[in-house]
Amino acid sequence: MDNQKKYHHGDLKNLLIYQVLEAVKKNKLESFSIRDASRLLNVSAAAPYKHFQDKQSLIISSIVYCQNIFYSYLNEQIEKNTFSSHMQLINLGKCYLKYAFENPELFTFMFSLPLSGKERLHNYDKFHKLFVYTIKENLDEDSFRKRVSKSSAVNAAWSMVHGIACLIASKTISDEEVDGYINGKSFEEISAIWAVGVSKPPKYKL
């Protein structure tokens, strides 16, 4: 009984999020219910509502959780990589695409619903700063075209990478194309397209 009480009060919030993510992986989110999850976790039907107001709030918390995991993964890849600085943007982009390929359901889920203003800005800012840091390391400050701001350059890079990631997660493009982006030269090609559009031309730091 004591173990169940500890389980109920200590881990229930995260375990409910885990149940949502399992439903996402199995494409069963629509039929997911807090009541069924409570039964599976052997807690009272009322217990989850001490953590979440309703199913929607649980789903939103699960999205934020997913985005935090994704951000940590990308940040870890940046910190541990041994690439020269001009390869960091390519490395970040390829890791972004690889995550979408290996976790298609979760990737689609984490960007599927709009968050509240505060949550949206917080999560946007984290991903935005990753690209800002990488581009800053990749290009000199005076490399951008006069009519291109750093913010626009960052958003263009992020949009390009995220768009391809969505194509990968939704299985819209072939496995051969996916492999080209993650392991081949395709990503270098779109990086060159981005660089031509925002720079005059880029001056890579060696």
Residue ranges of each PLM-predicted region?
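C-terminal peripheral helix-coil segments that are non-catalytic and often amphipathic
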Residues: 133-141, 163-206
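Append "Primarily bacterial transcriptional regulators
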Residues: 20, 32-39, 48
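Hydrophobic alpha-helical connector segments
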Residues: 76-105, 150-157
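Alpha-helical DNA-contacting segments of helix-turn-helix folds
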Residues: 24, 60-66, 110, 123, ...
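Short secondary-structure transition hinges
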Residues: 102-133, 176-180
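Basic, helix-initiating cap at the start of DNA-binding domains
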Residues: 1-27, 36, 57
